Amino acid sequence: MFAKLKKKIAEETAVAQRPGGTTRIPRSVSKESVASMGADSGDDFASDGSSSREDLSSQLLRRNEQIRKLEARLSDYAEQVRNLQKIKEKLEIALEKHQDSSMRKFQEQNETFQASRAKMAEGLALALARKDQEWSEKMEQLEKDKRFLTSQLQEVKNQSLSLFQKRDEIDELEGFQQQEISKVKHMLLKKEECLGKMEQELDARTRELNRTQEELVTSNQLSSDLNERLEELQRHCSTLEEQRDHLTASKAGAEHKIVVLEQKEQELQAIIQQHSIDLQKVTAETQEKEKVITHLQEKVIFLEKRLEQNLSGEDHVQELLKEKTVAEQNLEDTRQQLLAARNSHTKALYLLETRVKDLERSLQAAEEQLSQSRNVVADQEAQIQKLITTNQENSLSQQQVLALEQHCRERIHALEAQIEALEQTRVADQIASEQGMLQLQQENVALKESRNECEHSLQHHQLELKKLKDEWSQREIVSVAMAQALEEVRKQREEFQQQATELTAIIEEKNQSLCEKDEALLQKEQELRQLEKGHSSALLQMHKLQRELEALKTCKAQEAMPATTGEDCLPLQGQEPLVISKAMQNSEYELPAAEGTPNGEVGASDLKQLQKEKQDLEQQLIEKNKIMKQMQQRMLELKKTLQKELKIRPDSELFEVREKTGPEIPNMAPSVTNNTDLTDAREINFEYLKHVVLKFMSCRESEAFHLIKAVSVLLNFSQEEENMLKETLEYKMSWFGSKPTPKGSIRPSISNPRIPWS
């Protein structure tokens, strides 16, 4: 934000600078600067101690010339001020004339526009009234035709609706039939799904039973020695053969049952036959499972008896030895068979060995699995009971299906009778509809003829509408042109108002600058008067000093000793210009030594006093030269600031005056300004920066409230200015809201136009 302000100030200073690069007009000149303008050769005057009266007169002439130049410069400044006042008066007169002419033009244009607008409004109102009457008559005719056509269309629609209602009723009956059939099919599909689920459950349970049987066999095999394992394997093979025989027998019975069920399926539906077959399978499997369970129980009893016999005396041991011999013979036979089997079934043996290892590892868990298997058997018995109940439910569902089939057949017969009746009614409706269609076709022909007539009338009306639209568009074009002209007039008015505001601001700034220049001229006139008074007093003192010097010289000539006269004259000659310079600078200066010496005699104390005064005067001259340099630097700075503020380029006369006065000050070097000069420049810059920031921040969007707060603290804004900035920021940041009215921040124009706050 501050970088943008700095750039803007730099651009304004660059525009305000003069292309020739000359110095600027000072705002005010102090007494010391004007007094020191003629003292540029003070160093030469102070250093040249042996100058004569001719040098003194030449210096006085120089001073007179400098005073004349200053008077000429003051007259030039006065002429410039007069010229500026004349320019100001001319600008004010031109601005008033321009405003009067613009207001007259605007009033004339406004009156002509209002008159033309009233005429156009009257013509348009008459034309629209006529057209409204014509269109109202045409619309009445069209409404009558429309009513007649709508009545005919309503009759046709009613007939078509009756036909469509009958068709919808037939479609609804067919839909009800299809819905009932689909319901039956859906019920059958549900039953099939239930049966499939039951089959899956039975398969899973049979697998579990097989697993339990295998686990029991493996646990028995692992509990005995290798010989007992071989015997158990043989027994297991025999049991497997028996199971295979049982399975083949059950398969044959199942096939017989399947044949019977297929015969039943021909009588009933396919789903009911499958259900009965599944029930028979379940019963057969349950019987087989009961047989297997009884066989396993017999094996367990046999094994327990064998264990009891083993626990008895030596007779049992002999019997066991016999059995051992028989078992050894059997082992040899089985070994031969095993050798033959190993050659043919190596892969099966490898798998069995791996399984034996796994079973050895699972010996510890076998007992737990036995207890679990007993629990599983109990669960299976409960499941068998559940299956029996499901079988009963299936029988009930079969009975329900039969009842539903009978109900469906009865419903189908009733629906067929309804369909026949509906077909008869449909035939009658078709005959009636054909007759109605003939009538409708005749009516349609009449309607087409009337429609053609309506179309012809509509085309005629459309042509008239096009003509009216063309006329309306032409009038709209005229009104748009008038509106554009009004907008241009309004824009010109706004531009004139802006120009007027700018001119008023420029005039006010010029008035301020003129006031400042008047003050500077008054100060310069006062300084000139003081200089004239000082000049006259200096001339009087010079005459007095000359008389005193002549008296001193006559006194010195009367003395006898020439050496003493020479020694006394030298310091007096060196002190003459110093006394003269002191008299020129101080109008109230008087020589106390000349007054204090009676009879014109000069002593050693007078010489010492004159030397001290000489040193004081030299120091005062040095200080005055420094002050002159500072004042010249201040004049240059004031000229620059004045041109920055007013943006006024000096005339050619100022160039000539400065070219004349330029070589008179060749040895003036810039020096550091006083604290008062810095404060004045800072005040000017402060006011200017405040004006720029106010204008910038009120015309464009600011970034945040804290920036306004910071700037208001730095620049010492008043509470009204800070509130105005906050209100403008809130208005620009909000969607809705009224524009804030500025209070004293923007000056009104001469004609008091309404300035939009942006």
Swiss-Prot record:
The GRIP domain covers which part of the protein? Answer: 679-728
- Describe its PTM? MARylated by PARP12; MARylation is required for basolateral export of E-Cadherin.
Keywords associated with the record: ADP-ribosylation, Coiled coil, Cytoplasmic vesicle, Golgi apparatus, Membrane, Phosphoprotein
Q: Which cysteines are joined by disulfide bonds?
A: none
Is the keyword Coiled coil assigned to this protein?
A: yes
InterPro entries in alphabetical order: Golgi-autophagy_related, GRIP_dom
Q: Where in the cell is it found?
A: Golgi apparatus membrane; Golgi apparatus, trans-Golgi network membrane; Cytoplasmic vesicle, Secretory vesicle, Acrosome
Indicate where the modification Phosphoserine is found in the sequence: S30, S36, S41, S47, S50, S51
Statement: the UniProt record of this protein carries the keyword Phosphoprotein: yes
Recorded GO cellular component terms are: acrosomal vesicle; Golgi apparatus; membrane; perinuclear region of cytoplasm; trans-Golgi network
Coiled coil where?
50-648
Coarse class of the primary localization is: Golgi
Q: What is known of its domains?
A: Extended rod-like protein with coiled-coil domains.
Known role: Involved in vesicular trafficking at the Golgi apparatus level. Involved in endosome-to-Golgi trafficking. Mechanistically, captures transport vesicles arriving from endosomes via the protein TBC1D23. Recognized vesicles are then tethered to the trans-Golgi before subsequent SNARE engagement and vesicle fusion. Selectively regulates E-cadherin transport from the trans-Golgi network in tubulovesicular carriers.
Q: What is this protein called?
A: Golgin subfamily A member 1
Q: Which organism is it from?
A: Mus musculus (Mouse)
